[in-house]
């Protein structure tokens, strides 16, 4: 709405009646009068101050453009005189005297301001009780929120918090609620713009709004704890050793519907202070080494779930089962080994060979199984190099040393 403000500092004189409506506004100690269109509301052809479809409206447009006619000047001066008399109530700071129309209006001639082709009218201000006056529709915040929830478009999504400053200008509500739209701005952020012909209404977040992933393919990461239990008799742990019931983080990666589980490789610490008699001196077979570990250090940080955690060497080397026979101080890591050892002291041999004509008996079941191979001729242990077979595993271990240290190297060592 365009307001034409005219300062009432000059002296005007006219006995005619006003035309149109009045809006008085006081700024400080100076009185201003707001001049709307003097044309009637019922005249649809002259509903805009800029439309010139009738002689009266043409005269009004000419006075806005700077060329005032005598009749239009008289009507405006009559309107200002009567309204100033009613508004001031006899106590206005401006005095009304005799002055000619063209001389009084001349200093305030200016070019017409660009206005929209719409008709605006100011409400009347009666002198009665202000509570009884019908006021324009002003919705509350609850009504606006309900309207937005019912009529918000599904394409409108929640805007990130960093762009809240950009949406402050769009959050002012007008008298009638309207829908708001989001358009991508030139700087990469989202900006709010009102629909054509109306003001924007605040609220850029729908009831089910969420962030819209417009970037690359989403990758979902989920961390799950995996408990790793240790034996209860491990004793005091060193500073570099993990405590009991350690939870190792398991990472689940979901890429395009396919889930991959990654777990860190548990590398045994090298700073274990163990007695020398518990240290293994036998070489570890190549196939028994964990994947990814080499002489230069551990392998990659993550392995697939198919690989098992390597056992803690400290838990394997600690012998907690001690022989109670007088004069014997042997200790074993397993109770079954201790029971087999006690049979040697007692002389008990419960495992007997069932081969015809053989009456051998043994205190351990593995000894009986090894003895049966001597009757059947089965040799399950085969050398991977020369494919030679053996009935006992210890015989195979001794044979592998031949391939590790050939006869030529051994002969050279003996000569040196």
Swiss-Prot record:
Tissue: Highly expressed in liver, skeletal muscle, and kidney. Expressed in cardiomyocytes. Expression is highly reduced in cardiac tissue of patients with non-ischemic cardiomyopathy and aortic aneurysm, and in glomerular disease. Not expressed in bone marrow or lymphoid tissues.
Cellular component, GO annotation: chromatin; intracellular membrane-bounded organelle; nuclear speck; nucleoplasm; nucleus
Compositional bias ranges of the Basic and acidic residues kind: 156-168
Record localization: Nucleus
Region (Disordered): 156-219
Gene3D superfamilies: Classic Zinc Finger
Description of what induces expression: In podocytes, up-regulated by retinoic acid.
Zinc finger (C2H2-type): 321-345, 351-375, 381-403
Organism encoding this protein: Homo sapiens (Human)
Protein's recorded name: Krueppel-like factor 15
Gly residues bias spans: 199-212
Keyword tRNA processing assigned: no
Described function: Transcriptional regulator that binds to the GA element of the CLCNKA promoter. Binds to the KCNIP2 promoter and regulates KCNIP2 circadian expression in the heart. Is a repressor of CCN2 expression, involved in the control of cardiac fibrosis. It is also involved in the control of cardiac hypertrophy acting through the inhibition of MEF2A and GATA4. Involved in podocyte differentiation. Inhibits MYOCD activity. Is a negative regulator of TP53 acetylation. Inhibits NF-kappa-B activation through repression of EP300-dependent RELA acetylation.
UniProt cross-references to SUPFAM superfamilies, sorted A to Z: beta-beta-alpha zinc fingers
MF annotations from Gene Ontology: DNA-binding transcription activator activity, RNA polymerase II-specific; DNA-binding transcription factor activity, RNA polymerase II-specific; RNA polymerase II cis-regulatory region sequence-specific DNA binding; RNA polymerase II transcription regulatory region sequence-specific DNA binding; sequence-specific double-stranded DNA binding; transcription cis-regulatory region binding; zinc ion binding
């Amino acid at each position: 709405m365009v307001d034409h403000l005219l300062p009432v500092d000059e002296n005007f004189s006219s006995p005619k009646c006003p035309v149109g409506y009045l809006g008085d506004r006081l700024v400080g100690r100076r009185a201003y009068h707001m001049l709307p269109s003097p044309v009637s509301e019922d005249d649809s052809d002259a509903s805009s101050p800029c439309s010139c479809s009738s002689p009266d409206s043409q005269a009004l447009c000419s006075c806005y453009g700077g060329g005032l006619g005598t009749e239009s000047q008289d009507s405006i001066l009559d309107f200002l005189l009567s309204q100033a008399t009613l508004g001031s109530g006899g106590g206005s700071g401006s005095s009304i005297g005799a002055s000619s129309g063209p001389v009084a209006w001349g200093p305030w001639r200016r070019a017409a301001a660009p206005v929209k082709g719409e008709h605006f009218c100011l409400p009347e201000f009666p002198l009665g009780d202000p509570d009884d006056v019908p006021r324009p529709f002003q919705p509350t915040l609850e009504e606006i929120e309900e309207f937005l929830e019912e009529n918000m478009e599904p394409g409108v999504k929640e805007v990130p918090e960093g762009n809240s400053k950009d949406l402050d200008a769009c959050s002012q509500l007008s008298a009638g609620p309207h829908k708001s739209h989001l358009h991508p701005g030139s700087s990469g952020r989202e900006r709010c713009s009102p629909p054509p012909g109306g003001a924007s209404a605040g609220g850029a977040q729908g009831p089910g709004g969420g962030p819209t992933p417009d970037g690359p393919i989403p990758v979902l990461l989920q961390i799950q704890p995996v408990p790793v239990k240790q034996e209860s008799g491990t004793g005091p742990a060193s500073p570099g050793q993990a405590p009991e019931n350690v939870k190792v983080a398991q990472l689940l990666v979901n890429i395009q519907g396919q889930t991959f589980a990654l777990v860190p490789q548990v590398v045994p610490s090298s700073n274990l202070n163990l007695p020398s008699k518990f240290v293994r001196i036998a070489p570890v077979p190549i196939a028994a080494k964990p994947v990814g570990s080499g002489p230069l250090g551990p392998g990659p940080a993550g392995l697939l779930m198919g690989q098992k955690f390597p056992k803690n060497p400290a838990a394997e080397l600690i012998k907690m089962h001690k022989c109670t026979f007088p004069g014997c101080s042997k200790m074993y890591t397993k109770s079954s080994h201790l029971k087999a050892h006690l049979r040697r002291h007692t002389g008990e041999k419960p495992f007997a060979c069932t081969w015809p004509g053989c009456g051998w008996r043994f205190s351990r079941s593995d000894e009986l199984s090894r003895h049966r191979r001597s009757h059947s001729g089965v040799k399950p242990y085969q050398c991977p190099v020369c494919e030679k077979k053996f009935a006992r595993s210890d015989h195979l271990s001794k044979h592998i040393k031949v391939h590790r240290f050939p006869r030529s190297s051994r002969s050279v060592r003996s000569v040196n």
